[in-house]
Amino acid sequence: MKRKNSKKTSWRFFSDPVLVHAAAWIAVWCIYVGLRFNSISIPLERDEGLFGYIGQVIRDGGLPYRDAIDHKPPGVYYIYAAALLLFPPTPAGVHLFLLLYNALTLMALYGVVRLARGSPSAGLLTALSYAVLSSSPQVEGFAASTEMILLLPLALSLASALLAIRWSSVVMAFASGALAAAVVWIKHTGIFFALTVFCLQLAVQQSADFQRSRQMRSSAGYAAAWLAGFFALSLGVVGYFYIRGGGDDFLYWNFIFNYYYGTGQDIVSSLPKLSASLRALCTAHPVIVGAALGCVVFGVAVRDVRGLCLLLFLVASLAAVVPGYAYPHYFAQLTPALALGAGFGLERFTNAVASARLRQGLIALCCCGVCGVPVWQDVGYYVRSSSDELSKRFFSPNPFPETIEAATYIAHNSTQRDKVFIFGSEAQILFYSRRKSASRFVLLYPLTRTIYPQHRLHQQQAWDEITQSRPTYVVVVNVFQSVLWDGKADLWLYRQLMDFVAQRYELVAAVPVAYPRGRLITHPDSNKIAKEIADYKYTIKIFRRRYDA
């Protein structure tokens, strides 16, 4: 009798949709956290360090572009500045913020599915697919990059657009436009997503499904409200920088510099890399990609509005990925479209089975495929490898683990008033140590490449700032990827800096770049430090200003 009662209780649990739904959400969150756990402490890569440092500058009252230079849109810096209110300037702190921030994106995508008349199971399958895809090494989902950051306002913009149609609300249309603008002000390629959201809301509004439910006031009224939100936020961003006295710098580094940056990119030559990255993504996540593509093909074949909208969203996502150097983190922009397609596609596939028990078993099997295949293919990333080993695997020979050693030394041997100049692009040293740069040029390649007409002027400006600030420490990063000299630009700044260092500074520490992490070398005799690092190809050298200089 007890065994029969146990079976009845078990079946009652699986027949209760509320309990099943709650258990499914618990499973999704456990999988989401579990997939990210091993990568939470990966040393920050170059962009993360730069975003974090500029976030610190903002918190100290500074202004991006005027007080610290990068050529990304400003949104990401302010998001980092907000994150630093709660999270420490460490790899684990930044990546814990990403874990929570990205969880909001996951929930927003679930909301998009439900607002698009998807079932709870389609929403959960979308959430699971996004949990897996967004943590994937193929998209460098462990890094708090602009690509990962823009996904939340993108998902919220989609959800707001659907709410605007459902509620016949111009306020939600305005919010959708403003959120789409936020995507653009996090990464310029977000313009493809903004245009897509605008087109999708018009397409969905005209669909028979929504026409039968509730009419919007008019297509023109909705479009006007959406555009008003988009331009209101954009004008607010531009106006803010001009009011703060940084308008010219904002204009140059966001648009003029990026024009020259784009001239150094050849899309044709990046196609093999693009193709290889797409193949790797498909190989690692065959169930998700297959279900998403199947959903799109079926939707187009039967002229289903959701399938057509997913096709447009997927094309826009690819358009956002293509410009540039096809770096792996660019492909994070594909994850929402693929996750939505997988959620709807897997639901359609499993609903073809008539038996409820068989359908539940098929759903469980699909979920195992979604999660199990990528983990089985890359156990090292998800379970075995250390944080430093993962950093070297993805970014070698970049000295990202070694920057922690350098930052720790500087933090312990200086005060917050002391300034540091880094000949290289390793702003994470400044971020970890909480020290200010002696120059606003914390990114070096605008000074070392001839495609930028003002590179020589910027060298002079950097030199003027260095001599005026008299930094306590000068850090020289002997890694090509940190300097990106094109072999043609006049390295006048480097020569001036080395003469300056020879006269007034002494070598006090060095970190050789080694696997998985080079260790700090210190000695009172600088000659012995130089001797110890002589056999290493890549190094970080730390010079301190002499007390009599």
Predicted regions and their residues:
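Perimembrane helix-loop-helix junctions
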Residues: 5-6, 10-13, 193-231, 296-303, ...
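Transmembrane-helix signature of polytopic, membrane-embedded enzymes
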Residues: 19, 109-133, 151-152, 165-171, ...
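Hydrophobic, aromatic-rich transmembrane alpha-helices
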Residues: 107, 279-317, 342
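Membrane-interface transmembrane helices that cradle and orient dolichyl/undecaprenyl
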Residues: 157-175, 202-210, 287-305, 346
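Short hydrophobic alpha-helices at membrane interfaces in multi-pass membrane enzymes
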Residues: 163-181, 211-224, 228, 307-314
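Membrane-interface alpha helices of multi-pass inner-membrane proteins
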Residues: 172-188, 194-201, 232, 237, ...
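Short periplasmic/luminal acceptor-recognition loop of GT-C membrane glycosyltransferases, typified by
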Residues: 176-178, 195, 384, 396-449, ...
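Hydrophobic/aromatic-rich transmembrane helices and adjacent perimembrane loops
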Residues: 192-193, 317-319, 323-358
